[in-house]
Design a protein with these regions (language model features):
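Alpha-helix capping and helix-loop boundary segments enriched in small/acidic/polar residues
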Residues: 18, 22, 97-100, 124
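Solvent-exposed residues in well-ordered beta-strands and their adjoining turns
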Residues: 11-13, 136
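Hydrophobic/aromatic-rich core segments of domains that either
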Residues: 103-170
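Secondary-structure boundary elements
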Residues: 14-93
């Protein structure tokens, strides 16, 4: 970003300039509409809420791509795997067709928070099974999982996946289950680098100054 202008870098090795321009135009247009809709909000918590509600209203979990990913990682031959949505893990997937998996949810949340003036980080679990966010509200950082909020239908302030400490996030996980969906959605083990150098999320209640 320079002088208030954002540059979109789309890592799409085989797309034409026309296709990339289409992505850019759509993202800029939708972003502008959303920013206009929240221009009267001046509170961190309300801006964050507007971001995740916008995502939940316009995103759909891409179960077809999830199944493809799960089959591939379990040794199913590539030719037997379903078609794969290559944009499911980024903001292009959200803004173009609304179909994403956890990476797309988290990248979009990070993007919307950032363009609206909130600090936000994209977080991957230690073995990259899942992605979520940390968002800075006022002077403290909190964990939030928009994927599980959308697919689990729980976006209330009382939820254990909305603006909670990292320890609360970890306490939600049940790694004893054999259900692959539970593991992919809810595995919140931090990678070593972010655990050592990242912001600390230690509060379970947002405290306004």
């Amino acid at each position: 970003m320079e002088n208030g202008e954002y540059a979109f870098i789309l890592k799409k090795g085989y797309d034409s300039r026309e296709v990339i321009n289409t992505y850019r135009d759509q993202i800029e247009s939708k972003t502008g509409e959303w920013l206009e809709s929240i221009q009267d909000l001046d509170d961190d918590l309300l801006i964050e809420k507007a971001a995740y509600e916008y995502i939940m209203e316009n995103a759909e979990y891409d179960f077809d791509t999830f199944n493809t990913m799960f089959q591939y990682t379990n040794g199913v031959p590539v030719e037997e795997v379903n078609p794969y949505n290559e944009n499911c893990q980024n903001i292009v997937g959200f803004f173009m067709d609304g179909k994403v998996v956890c990476g797309g949810y988290a990248r979009t949340m990070q993007y919307l928070c950032n363009v609206a003036g909130l600090d936000s980080l994209y977080i991957e679990s230690g073995r990259r099974e899942h992605a979520w966010n940390m968002v800075k509200l006022y002077d403290d950082w909190y964990c939030i999982d928009v994927t599980w909020m959308d697919t689990g239908g729980d976006a209330t302030p009382e939820s254990k996946i909305v603006n909670k400490s990292y320890e609360t996030f970890r306490s939600n996980d049940d790694t004893s289950t054999n259900d692959p969906m539970s593991g992919m959605f809810r595995y919140h083990a931090l990678g070593g680098l972010i655990q050592k150098m990242g912001p600390k999320c230690v509060k379970d209640t947002v405290e306004k100054p």
